[in-house]
Amino acid sequence: MGIIESIILGIVEGLTEFLPVSSTGHLILVSKLLGLEQTDAHKAFEVAIQSGAILAVVFLYREKLTHSIDLWKRLIIAFIPTGILGFLLYKIIKGLFSPYIVSIMLIVGGLVFIAVEFFYKKSEHQIDDILKIPYYKAFFIGVFQSIAMIPGTSRSGATIIGGLLLGLDRKTAAEFSFLLAVPTMFAATSYDIMKNYHHFHIENWIALLTGFVTAFVFAVLAIKLFIGFVSRYNFVPFGIYRIILGFIFLLFVL
């Protein structure tokens, strides 16, 4: 893989990892357009550049992450369902990675977002701060996150939908989704790297580093823009986008 390809994939990863649009789907589609095969080495590269996106959340929310034990209690509780299921079902989950499943889940997720927003009602009793999330609700948001182990679902999409259904306002649901990515993606990425370390070679380090840095920069940008967007608008545009992307997937990838 060349530097240009690693930059493009880093941009795609950074922009889509924390948006409810499935970064996996975008990476598969863009890789296809670039003529890159979905080899084990290529998948290992995608896993590695996710670390750059994780670092973006740590950088932006470093104050909350380093000064709030109550926040970490909620994150750990929310991580439990995904952590257990991810460890037990690792091989099954990896076997689900197919363009067809990604396409279907993109479309289904888009329809769910539109439906949730249709019934969503803003009220004075909504949870508007992460530290006000009851522990049992944090756990159930983690259950929703577990659904995202199906490729194309979108981890952020599943957790945001879970948050909205459990009474969080849009901004709080989005921020909790970002923060929950830290333990979740750190564990998943670390496990994947341990499983696929033999695919990382010295000659690939420049491309890996380039993709990592690019993903970090664009993830910072995406998170800031996304929080500004959901503070004023709803998630319907993302639902529509997912449906369109799902059909594009069916045309170009299958």
UniProtKB/Swiss-Prot annotation:
The EC number(s) this enzyme carries: 3.6.1.27
Alphabetical UniProt keywords: Antibiotic resistance, Cell inner membrane, Cell membrane, Cell shape, Cell wall biogenesis/degradation, Hydrolase, Membrane, Peptidoglycan synthesis, Transmembrane, Transmembrane helix
Transmembrane segments: 1-21, 41-61, 75-95, 96-116, 130-150, 174-194, 210-230, 234-254
GO CC, any one term: plasma membrane
Catalytic activity field: di-trans,octa-cis-undecaprenyl diphosphate + H2O = di-trans,octa-cis-undecaprenyl phosphate + phosphate + H(+)
Further facts: Bacitracin is thought to be involved in the inhibition of peptidoglycan synthesis by sequestering undecaprenyl diphosphate, thereby reducing the pool of lipid carrier available.
Protein name as catalogued: Undecaprenyl-diphosphatase
